[in-house]
């Protein structure tokens, strides 16, 4: 006999949760959906109520990693007047009706502390760490993290001292931050360099080099061969965590490194004083011009680079508008780079074009690629 309620009515039937894809098990359906390129997620969320929350599901991204369907997505910070802090964007790839690809920078939520200037940036898997920076010329010890899966921000433990224009790099699950503070007291002296353990979420001081090499501001940083390179206007430093050893950078590297750079297959790429892209091989200790990209403009200023899945992505500021135009174009190019023989590095431009238009006097702060 069927159970009844105290009033004699039949109990309401419990509805089973809707299936993602009818006739498929949840595991199989999730495995299929995880392979859909991320640029289609906004459309995917419109398919049904069941799909609506799918793009914000941690299980979906865990499945993407499990089935090898992750993508390298470009994120860009741009300072746009009158804002003093950075506005954040991500590069969106769209396929148009005529089967051509369209690339554009689309806005995402900016850091809750938007007025930070001179922060250091590192990527750890699907997260971007924004480290320090100054607020009204006062160095901050704050650390913000952008979760690139969901475009949400959170704070983690503060550094031991405030910093601006520091260098940072990630090695073996630890973030090393160097410089960016004046060594004018005991606390700043022992914390001129410090390390953040991602697993324990704690900061520890790193034994610093001598006073003569402890610069305040760093203009560039990178990780090569298990070492963090921190470059200043003079007296750059190199730290090797495994040996806990400090050393000076090779002179040829120091003289040739200009602006934002990135490392691909252990070659450091940046642009030189003539605006040409060059690559530095730390084993051979030599700079070589990147050939095959002569159609790109000369990057005299306002350019930055990122390693996006093994491709060299270059972002630069186009010419500012003149006359009645008060707008400036942001350009992007993606280059397939690699060695040719023993003495040459070549690049093939896979695409290049305008990805955003911004007011004059805007400036690219940084670009990074995260895995999602």
UniProtKB/Swiss-Prot annotation:
<dbReference type="InterPro" id="IPR015915">
    <property type="entry name" value="Kelch-typ_b-propeller"/>
</dbReference>
<keyword id="KW-0833">Ubl conjugation pathway</keyword>
<feature type="repeat" description="Kelch 1">
    <location>
        <begin position="127"/>
        <end position="173"/>
    </location>
</feature>
<feature type="domain" description="F-box">
    <location>
        <begin position="19"/>
        <end position="66"/>
    </location>
</feature>
<keyword id="KW-0880">Kelch repeat</keyword>
<dbReference type="InterPro" id="IPR001810">
    <property type="entry name" value="F-box_dom"/>
</dbReference>
<dbReference type="Pfam" id="PF00646">
    <property type="entry name" value="F-box"/>
</dbReference>
<comment type="subunit">
    <text>Part of a SCF (SKP1-cullin-F-box) protein ligase complex. Interacts with SKP1A/ASK1.</text>
</comment>
<feature type="repeat" description="Kelch 2">
    <location>
        <begin position="175"/>
        <end position="226"/>
    </location>
</feature>
<feature type="repeat" description="Kelch 4">
    <location>
        <begin position="261"/>
        <end position="307"/>
    </location>
</feature>
<feature type="repeat" description="Kelch 3">
    <location>
        <begin position="228"/>
        <end position="260"/>
    </location>
</feature>
<dbReference type="Pfam" id="PF25210">
    <property type="entry name" value="Kelch_FKB95"/>
</dbReference>
<dbReference type="InterPro" id="IPR006652">
    <property type="entry name" value="Kelch_1"/>
</dbReference>
<protein>
    <recommendedName>
        <fullName>F-box/kelch-repeat protein SKIP6</fullName>
    </recommendedName>
</protein>
<dbReference type="InterPro" id="IPR050354">
    <property type="entry name" value="F-box/kelch-repeat_ARATH"/>
</dbReference>
<comment type="pathway">
    <text>Protein modification; protein ubiquitination.</text>
</comment>
<dbReference type="GO" id="GO:0016567">
    <property type="term" value="P:protein ubiquitination"/>
</dbReference>
<keyword id="KW-0677">Repeat</keyword>
């Amino acid at each position: 006999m069927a159970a009844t309620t105290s009033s004699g009515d039949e109990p309401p039937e419990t509805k089973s949760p809707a299936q993602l894809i009818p006739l498929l098990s949840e595991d199989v359906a999730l495995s299929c959906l995880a392979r859909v390129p991320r640029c289609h997620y906004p459309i995917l969320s419109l398919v049904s109520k069941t799909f609506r929350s799918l793009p914000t599901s941690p299980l979906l991204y865990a499945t993407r990693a499990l089935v090898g369907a992750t993508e390298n997505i470009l994120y860009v910070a741009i300072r746009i007047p009158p804002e003093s802090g950075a506005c954040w964007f991500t590069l969106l790839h769209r396929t148009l009706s005529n089967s051509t690809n369209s690339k554009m920078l689309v806005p995402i939520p900016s850091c809750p502390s938007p007025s930070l200037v001179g922060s250091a940036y590192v990527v750890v898997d699907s997260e971007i760490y924004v480290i320090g920076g100054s607020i009204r010329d006062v160095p901050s010890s704050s650390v913000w993290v952008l979760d690139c899966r969901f475009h949400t921000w959170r704070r983690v433990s503060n550094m031991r001292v405030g910093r601006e224009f520091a260098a940072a790099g990630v090695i073996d699950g630890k973030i090393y931050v160097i410089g960016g503070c004046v060594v004018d007291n005991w606390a700043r002296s022992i914390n001129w360099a410090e390390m953040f353990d991602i697993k324990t979420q704690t900061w520890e001081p790193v034994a610093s080099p001598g006073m003569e090499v402890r610069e305040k501001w760093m203009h560039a940083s990178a990780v090569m061969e298990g070492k963090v390179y921190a470059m200043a206007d003079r007296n750059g430093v190199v730290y090797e965590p495994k040996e806990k050893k400090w050393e000076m950078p090779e002179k040829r590297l120091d003289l040739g490194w200009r602006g934002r750079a990135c490392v691909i297959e252990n070659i450091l790429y940046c642009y030189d004083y003539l605006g040409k892209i060059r690559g530095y091989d730390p084993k051979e200790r030599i700079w070589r011009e990147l050939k095959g990209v002569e159609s790109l403009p000369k990057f005299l200023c306002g350019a930055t680079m990122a390693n996006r899945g093994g491709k060299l992505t270059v972002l630069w500021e186009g010419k500012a508008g003149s006359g009645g135009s008060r707008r400036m174009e942001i350009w992007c190019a993606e280059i397939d780079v690699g060695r040719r023989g023993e003495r040459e590095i070549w690049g093939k431009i896979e695409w290049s074009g305008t990805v955003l238009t911004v007011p004059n006097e805007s400036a690219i702060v940084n670009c990074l690629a995260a895995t999602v």
